[in-house]
Amino acid sequence: MFRVAEFEKKGGRQVFKGFAVAGYRMGQRGQLKHYRKKIETKDRRKKNYVELNLATGQTDLKGKMIYEKDLVLDKEENQVCRVDFCKGYAAFVLIASLLDFEFPLSFLDKRNQKFEVVGNIYEGKKK
């Protein structure tokens, strides 16, 4: 399961447009297609593109699905972290920021239900 974040070119920049809800599928070789047309998944600044966010398979305190690139509030640490997939660990990790330094805070553990989704990197934190 994944969600698709759509971006469009505006004034030489790529701007987050929204999350697509239909029309995308994954081909047998892993290429993303919109109906029958293969679409761009890299930011080349000349045309619109999309990013895939994998679902973690876990829900937050309110039952909302947690995706890669979501911002979650860790209720125990009282800190907002970004959810990322770490290839080295082959797991989803929580990335915390301290000034300009980012570090893995902890693994996203299914037994640990202390997180609440408060936004994502595209739209920022919800108030």
Listing of model-derived features with the role each one plays in the protein:
Residues M1-K127:
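Secondary-structure transition motif
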